[in-house]
Design a protein with these regions (language model features):
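Expand to "…catalyze enediolate/carbanion chemistry for C-C bond making/breaking, isomerization
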Residues: 1-98
């Protein structure tokens, strides 16, 4: 059976610690640089900015390589959009206009 990936942000918050989440990376290379700095999470902006849905799998894989939690803001508050975003690797979802 597949194992869930550790969610560094969730684990730190549950332990009462602060988590560092960086917003703005829009390519895997930027995420690799952040991974080397030890950030806990990356905010992938899917509502505003240059990120297209097709970019999300590569960005979440880059996060996985460094053990970084991928937090994705989806562009629509629709169950299908949220499910698909989780299916391609997002560990946390931010829903707009809620």
């Amino acid at each position: 059976m597949a194992e869930l990936r550790p969610n560094r942000v969730k684990n730190k918050l549950a332990a009462g610690l602060a988590a560092t989440v960086v917003a703005g990376p829009h390519n895997a290379e930027m995420i690799e640089h952040l991974g080397a700095l030890g950030v806990d999470g990356v905010w992938i902006e899917g509502e505003h900015g240059p990120i297209d849905y097709a970019d999300i799998p590569d960005l979440t894989r880059a996060c996985d390589l460094w053990g970084i939690t991928s937090v994705v803001r989806v562009n629509l508050n629709l169950p299908g959009v949220i499910y698909r975003t989780l299916d391609v690797g997002a560990q946390a979802i931010v829903v707009p206009h809620v």
